[in-house]
Amino acid sequence: MLKLLLGDPNARKLKRYQPIVSDINLLEEEVSPLSDDDLRRRTAEFRQRLDNAGSLDQQRPVLDELLPEAFAVVREAGKRVLGMRHFDVQLIGGMVLHEGQIAEMKTGEGKTLVATLPSFLNALTGRGVHVVTVNDYLARRDAEWMGQVHRFLGLSVGLIQQDMTPAERRRNYGCDITYATNSELGFDYLRDNMAADINEVVQREFQYCVIDEVDSILIDEARTPLIISGQVERPQEKYQKAAEVAAALTRAAEMGKDGIDPEGDYEVDEKQRSCTLTDEGFAKAEQMIGVADLYDPQDPWAHYITNALKAKDLFTRDVNYIVRDGEAVIVDEFTGRVMPGRRWSDGQHQAIEAKEALAIQPETQTLASITYQNFFLLYPRLAGMTGTAKTEETEFEKTYKLETTIVPTNRVRARQDWVDQVYKTEEAKWRAVAKETAEVHQQGRPVLVGTTSVEKSELLSALLAEEDIPHNLLNAKPENVEREAEIVAQAGRSGAVTIATNMAGRGTDIILGGNSDYMARLKLREVLLSRLVRPEEGHRPPVPLQRSGAEGGGGFAAKAAPASGPHGHAPSEARAIGSLYPCQLTEDTDQALADLAKDLVKAWGDRALTVIELEDHIATAAEKAPTDDPAIAALRAAIARVKGEYDDVVKQEEQRVREAGGLHVIGTERHESRRVDNQLRGRAGRQGDPGSTRFFLSLGDNLLRIFGGDRVAGLMNAFRVEEDMPIESGMLTRSLEGAQKKVETYYYDIRKQVFEYDEVMNNQRKAVYSERRRVLEGRELKKQVVGYGERTMNEIVEAYVNPDLPPEEWDVTQLVSKVQEFVYLLDDLQADQLQGLSMDELKAFLQEQLRNAYDLKEGQIEDQRPGLMREAERFFILQQIDTLWREHLQSMDALRESVGLRGYGQKDPLIEYKNEGYDMFLDMMTNMRRNVIYSMFMFQPAPPAGQSAGQRTTA
């Protein structure tokens, strides 16, 4: 009703941007004739106007005034450097991002180019802009590709990669615009707040941040906190024994009801992802281990058994993790990528290692942690872009105070979404997927099949191999990941079949007819690899070499390699079928490439580069930025020449693919989130291309099985249909959407809970980190320590003096001995000196005594070496903050686990957590102050000739 009265709020927002778009279009005529140098001078003019404004808050209105001119300049730079002109809708996207909102832009609408607009504008303040992507590859690609625009306009561009040193990181964070992944930013923030010296800090104060694939980072990853941990020793044999016990226990066929245990040793709740032992299971486990009680605090076993059961039933190999080089490596459930270096916490990863009989790594203790939710809220202005945000609009608004604006597409969408087909069994579903893939492949259309796990992708690969259908496989297995860019580059070619695990965040558009630009780069890489790259790099070409059967034809080879095995050939063979390149190069071009290789050997040395260095050179040559390097210029000319030859074939192929109907996308299971389904659909029909999509489901799919409930079970029995006959039912589709909404709400509640609990920690974290930073910067250290001492004196007075009693009854003797415990230099302080003083006078007198004693101590220490006192102050404060904060994190974790049970006593666990957590925090800060004072007075530096270190004692 409101929509009818007020109109669509999104349309109203877009209308507001229209006049500014017109202004930018008018300015284009003014900016176009400018020389490159004049264009760069505009950047300096903008900066001057901002410098005159002063603080960030005063600069904001000036930025808004500059927007039309700045956007016009960036658009012109994009045309000159990248050969890409920002469309009007992309300008709108840039305005949405500048205002600190989320821009929903469909796949293929050029989100990466849009980010150049607000990042340039906000970087003019000189306070730094962060552009965040989901992986290192995308960060590097965007910094190289889009960074050209910023560099052309005179801004510095930085890039943060996983293997960089602190010095490189600091240099890159110091740039005007820095490209990085969410995890690198978060971990650098935590490491900065564990630094022992201000020179180890790499980040500067946060200002403005644009997040690409914002839903993936702020929603999908919001349940996972970032943790930096140190190792703690736990007995490995417990994990191994627990894995043996778990293997011997029997899972109950169904959940228990009304407090009555089911038949079996333990029950599994897939929805809550938990395992619980029945009474029978407890007895069995205790007997097998030989203990009286699994919960015995002296020898606890329950935690190990629960983790072992979860590892057995809830963590599946090739779905949740893969085993590689003797390690269990996590597979990201949203992107299907492996995440080396990440581990599940609380001993869960060790339980999986025991299950797989791998070497068990030591368990860890948290040293610092933060959630992405609270990390990104540290930015004064945050913005994001994605193809799918509308379904999570409420969460963005409630958690992050971010509005979502849908930016219209540049061309009308021509994609057809065909109706879902539901099969009774999983087997029938996979046969139907293979059948439809074969039919569409025969029409000469490219097909992309999205699967939810490595295991399922390999199952389909085997089915297609039986049918003799050439295809490429893209999943978390290392041999496939290395060919990722190559597989995606040819996924739009005529008759290409690509099986991919979760296409979210893949970062490369599927171009109909194939990506000739990328194929040209790969050709150069193949030619130069053996001549320029060190042999010890252990490289093998990531691309299959040209196959004789497919030369000049474009498209994929129709026939497989010679048969081997029962199904014609193994899936591993089937993957690489089809030539990568659309045609064979002419003899002249082949000769030119051979000559180029010789010239580059002279320039860069015979096999002297790493693979990464070679790829960087090729990426630089593929850019349009001006270059003085003759080797890069020659490489650039070669890429253009090869691309020109490929283009002739690719353009014809693109026309054929368009006429046949474009890319067909097949989904093989509904994901728990509608958003991930929409991301997969969005791969077809980009920028007005033709295309179609269809989802194939079975009644045994996880989503329907776990969340569909009894209604779907009833439907299963009601459908007395053949197994291979698809069911199309409105009721079923509604059940399915209901199930997805239910899951989304369920996970939203979990994230909300994570956020609410972490909010308590967040306020404490901010207080501790700001105190720590003040110490690191060495600001007024003496004043700070003396302040700690004065508060400690006040606390001693309050502990030993009861203001309700007359002064003669106060225990002044005890008070004096307590003061002397902390400050041994006050040994001559007598109780009678304090007689007759009021409580306030007592505090003032003791504070005065403490200051005098501290000056005396400072004189003694500074006599040894000037500046030593400040160093000692910094060392002891940091040591105490770090030690106590680490212990506090553990106590807060334990509190959080125990507080849940208080719900049974009609108490709100969150309020209990807040109150007790606050008290624990105050205790921690009090202990920190007291320990620092005690340590400072006990500190006895070694004499200059020095044998022993000074005492470092804590109260």
Curated annotation (Swiss-Prot):
ATP binds at Q90, G108, E109, G110, K111, T112, D509. It catalyses: ATP + H2O + cellular proteinSide 1 = ADP + phosphate + cellular proteinSide 2. It comes from the Bacteria. One of its GO terms (molecular function) is protein-exporting ATPase activity. It is an enzyme of class 7 (translocase). It is a peripheral membrane protein. Monomer and homodimer. Part of the essential Sec protein translocation apparatus which comprises SecA, SecYEG and auxiliary proteins SecDF. Other proteins may also be involved. This is Protein translocase subunit SecA. The lineage of its organism: Bacteria, Bacillati, Cyanobacteriota, Cyanophyceae, Synechococcales.
